[in-house]
């Protein structure tokens, strides 16, 4: 759990 994840699986890479 390092990346902020919302309802849609969106990961700022």
Curated annotation (Swiss-Prot):
Pyrrolidone carboxylic acid modification, residue list: 1
Tissue expression summary: Expressed by the skin glands.
Alphabetized UniProt keyword annotations: Amphibian defense peptide, Pyrrolidone carboxylic acid, Secreted
GO-annotated biological processes: defense response
Stored Pfam families: Tryp_FSAP
The UniProt record lists the keyword S-adenosyl-L-methionine: no
Single GO cellular component term: extracellular region
Localisation: Secreted
Chief localization: secreted
Record keyword Secreted present: yes
Record family assignment: Belongs to the frog skin active peptide (FSAP) family. Tryptophillin subfamily.
Name under which the protein is recorded: Tryptophyllin-T3-3
Organism: Phasmahyla jandaia
């Amino acid at each position: 759990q390092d990346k902020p994840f919302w309802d849609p699986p969106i990961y700022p890479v």
